[in-house]
Swiss-Prot record:
UniProt cross-references to PROSITE patterns, sorted A to Z: DPCK
Gene giving rise to this polypeptide: coaE
Domain DPCK: 3-208
Predominant subcellular localization, coarse grouping: cytoplasm
Organism the protein comes from: Cupriavidus pinatubonensis (strain JMP 134 / LMG 1197)
Protein name: Dephospho-CoA kinase
Length: 208
C-alpha cells in the first residue's frame, strides 16, 4: 500500500485536506489525534507525565493540561525533550499498530499519515513513500490561527518560529497542495492527487 506523509505549517489546512482525502476513501492516521489519545484521562502517557512533571501537568479530569504543558516546554528545551521522550515512542507504537490493521483489512486504496512536524522529526521522511505538503502564505497562516485559536499575531509567529520554514517543507515535498485559494481549487487538487495515489498504489508503487 502506498503510504503518504501529509504535513504543513500551523494554519495551513492539514486537517481539512486530510478530511477531504478520507471522504474519497483514503485511510488516515493523524498523529495529533494519537497524541490526544495517549494524553486523555487514563491514557498510556499519563503515569509517565505525572512522574516527570508532577500532578500539576494534569487537568481536573485527569487529561494532560495542554495549555500548561505548552507554556512549560516553550520556555524549557529540556522539558520539551522529556515530554517528547514520553509521547513520541507511544505515538510511533500506535502508528505502527494502526497501519498494520489498515493494511490487513485491505479496505483503503492508500494510507495518509498526518504529521505536523514531519520535516522536523526526520525519521518520518524515511518511513513514508511520498511527502505531501499543504502550503499557503505566512500571512494566511497567521490570519487563520488568530481567528481559530484566538492567539495574538506574536503568539502565532512564536509558534511558526519553532517549526520548519515554508522553504524547508517544500524542499522535501513530492506533492504540494496550494491552500491559499477558494475551496473549488482545493477540491480540484485533492481530486487529482487522489487519482494519482490510487493509480500508484494499484500499480504496486510504494516509493516516489
Amino acid at each position: 500500500m502506498l503510504e503518504i506523509g501529509l504535513t504543513g505549517g500551523i494554519g495551513s489546512g492539514k486537517t481539512r485536506v486530510a478530511d477531504m482525502f478520507a471522504a474519497r476513501g483514503a485511510a488516515i492516521i493523524d498523529t495529533d489525534l494519537l497524541a490526544h489519545e495517549i494524553t486523555a484521562p487514563g491514557g498510556q502517557a499519563i503515569p509517565a507525565l505525572v512522574e516527570a512533571f508532577g500532578p500539576q501537568c494534569l487537568r481536573p479530569d485527569g487529561a494532560m493540561d495542554r495549555d500548561a504543558m505548552r507554556a512549560v516546554v516553550f520556555a524549557d528545551p529540556a522539558a520539551k525533550a522529556r515530554l517528547e521522550g514520553i509521547t513520541h515512542p507511544l505515538i510511533r507504537e500506535l502508528t505502527t499498530s494502526r497501519a498494520a490493521e489498515i493494511a490487513h483489512a485491505g479496505e483503503h486504496p492508500y494510507l495518509i499519515y498526518v504529521v505536523p512536524l514531519l520535516v522536523e522529526s526526520g525519521a518520518w521522511l524515511n518511513r513514508v513513500g511520498r511527502v505531501l505538503v499543504v502550503d499557503c502564505s505566512e500571512d494566511t497562516q497567521i490570519a487563520r490561527v488568530m481567528s481559530r485559536n484566538g492567539f495574538s499575531r506574536e503568539q502565532v509567529l512564536a509558534i511558526m518560529a519553532k517549526q520548519a520554514t515554508r522553504a524547508q517543507r517544500l524542499a522535501v515535498a513530492h506533492d504540494v497542495i496550494d491552500n491559499d485559494g477558494p475551496v473549488e481549487a482545493l477540491t480540484a487538487q485533492v481530486d487529482q492527487l487522489d487519482r494519482t495515489y490510487r493509480a500508484l498504489s494499484a500499480a504496486g508503487v510504494t516509493q516516489a
